[in-house]
C-alpha cells in the first residue's frame, strides 16, 4: 500500500492509529509519503530529545515513512544524514524506516516509478531574511518582531537550499532520461 499526505511541520499526530487505522494492516513494505515540510529534523544544531522521541516513534510505526523536502526544513542537518541507495534512488537515512527521498531521484515502489523533487520558495518571508551575524541583528529582530510581516533567520528558520541547485536539477534530468522520461508519479512540494 502507498499513502500520500501533505505538510506535517513536525506534527505527526495524523499517524496515530486512531486517526490512521489503515496502518493496522500495514507492514514496513507499505509506505506513507509526506510531500514536503516534514519538520521532523528541525532543531538548530543537533537532534533534540523531542526530535529523538518523535523520530523513534515514526520508526516504530508498522509502515515506512518517506518524505521529500519542502521549504520548511533544516537543510544543514538534513544533509548530514548518511546517503544510501534505496529502491533505485538516493535517500538520506534518518531512521531505518524514516527516509528522505532526495531530489531528482526515481524510485521503484509498489511496481511504480516515482520521481522525487522536493523544495519550494518560501512565501512567508515578506519581512526578509535576517543574518544572525549581522551587527544590527538584535535591532532588526526586535523591529520585525513588533511588526506584522513574517520573517526568517538564515540557518535558523530559512535555508537557501529550499530551492534546488543546478546539480540537483541536472541529476533529475539524467535520472529521468534513464527511464525514458516516463514515471508513474511525481512527488514534490508546493
Where are these regions (language model features)?
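Core catalytic region of metal-dependent phosphoesterases/phosphodiesterases
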Residues: 5, 10-109
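Active-site-proximal loop/helix segment associated with metal-binding centers of metalloenzymes
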Residues: 96, 112-190
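Extreme N-terminal starter segment of soluble prokaryotic enzymes
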Residues: 1-3
Amino acid at each position: 500500500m502507498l499513502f500520500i499526505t501533505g505538510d506535517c511541520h513536525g506534527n505527526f499526530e495524523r499517524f496515530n492509529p486512531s486517526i490512521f487505522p489503515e496502518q493496522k494492516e500495514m507492514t514496513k513494505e507499505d509506505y506513507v509519503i509526506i510531500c514536503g515540510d516534514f519538520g521532523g529534523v528541525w532543531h538548530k544544531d543537533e537532534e533534540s530529545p523531542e526530535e529523538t522521541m518523535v523520530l523513534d516513534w515514526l520508526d516504530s510505526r508498522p509502515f515506512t515513512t518517506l518524505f521529500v523536502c519542502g521549504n520548511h526544513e533544516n537543510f544543514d542537518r538534513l544533509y548530514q544524514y548518511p546517503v544510501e541507495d534505496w529502491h533505485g534512488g538516493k535517500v538520506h537515512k534518518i531512521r531505518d524506516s524514516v527516509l528522505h527521498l532526495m531530489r531528482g531521484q526515481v524510485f521503484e515502489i509498489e511496481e511504480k516509478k516515482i520521481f522525487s523533487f522536493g523544495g519550494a520558495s518560501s512565501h512567508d518571508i515578506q519581512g526578509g531574511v535576517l543574518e544572525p551575524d549581522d551587527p544590527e541583528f538584535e535591532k532588526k529582530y526586535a523591529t520585525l518582531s513588533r511588526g506584522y510581516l513574517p520573517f526568517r533567520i538564515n540557518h535558523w528558520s530559512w535555508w537557501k537550499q529550499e530551492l534546488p541547485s543546478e546539480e540537483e536539477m541536472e541529476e533529475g534530468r539524467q535520472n529521468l532520461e534513464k527511464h525514458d522520461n516516463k514515471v508513474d508519479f511525481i512527488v514534490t512540494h508546493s
